[in-house]
């Protein structure tokens, strides 16, 4: 598989390159703040950079007919409209979190929330000091899985890759569910799974959850 990375010089870009290369895939396109380096047409482009970079990423996908794996957070409706239009031409997958564990947790929470519908519930998320958006896209993803408005408490401290705690409370008892990303490698592994899934697929807007659960 030939692939490209938008945000190549960033922390996630470097992690993606490492994980993809270990599987024998060929990096043929690099994009970062210093410009572009293109060797060949990529089968898939992976972008974990910033929402501001999305228009250029979409243009590259159209130019090379590349599938898109998008892990950028803080997207607005205008960005989703761009993705919907692009998905008519190439396969696209977008997620605020490419951890397999988070996507399993998301499905679990949607069921648990039905059983504990009268319980209080809040979310606490912590990330490294350089993360710009708060609450995190993952916290919003988990809130949406709960199916109701819940308070989200955000911490930006140190070098934490990503902690998410969901606390359910009732009179006399609490349930705490925690997911911790130990390193950024988990997100790169998820991006690889998504990229390998998309190559050769028909155009469309795919979810990472359906990739994790085999199209259920």
Curated annotation (Swiss-Prot):
Coiled coil: none
Catalytic residue positions: 127, 131
Keywords carried by this UniProt record: Amino-acid biosynthesis, Cytoplasm, Diaminopimelate biosynthesis, Lysine biosynthesis, NAD, NADP, Oxidoreductase
Pathway as given in its UniProt record: Amino-acid biosynthesis; L-lysine biosynthesis via DAP pathway; (S)-tetrahydrodipicolinate from L-aspartate: step 4/4
EC number(s) given by UniProt: 1.17.1.8
Pfam families, alphabetized: DapB_C, DapB_N
Molecular functions (GO terms): 4-hydroxy-tetrahydrodipicolinate reductase; NAD binding; NADP binding; oxidoreductase activity, acting on CH or CH2 groups, NAD or NADP as acceptor
GO BP field: diaminopimelate biosynthetic process; lysine biosynthetic process via diaminopimelate
Positions bound to NAD(+): 7-12, 71-73, 95-98
Binding site for (S)-2,3,4,5-tetrahydrodipicolinate: 128, 137-138
Catalytic activity: (S)-2,3,4,5-tetrahydrodipicolinate + NAD(+) + H2O = (2S,4S)-4-hydroxy-2,3,4,5-tetrahydrodipicolinate + NADH + H(+); (S)-2,3,4,5-tetrahydrodipicolinate + NADP(+) + H2O = (2S,4S)-4-hydroxy-2,3,4,5-tetrahydrodipicolinate + NADPH + H(+)
Enzyme class: oxidoreductase
A GO CC annotation given for this chain: cytosol
Subcellular location(s) per record: Cytoplasm
Gene3D superfamilies: NAD(P)-binding Rossmann-like Domain
Family per similarity comment: Belongs to the DapB family.
Role this protein plays: Catalyzes the conversion of 4-hydroxy-tetrahydrodipicolinate (HTPA) to tetrahydrodipicolinate.
Full protein name: 4-hydroxy-tetrahydrodipicolinate reductase
Organism in which the protein naturally occurs: Thermotoga neapolitana (strain ATCC 49049 / DSM 4359 / NBRC 107923 / NS-E)
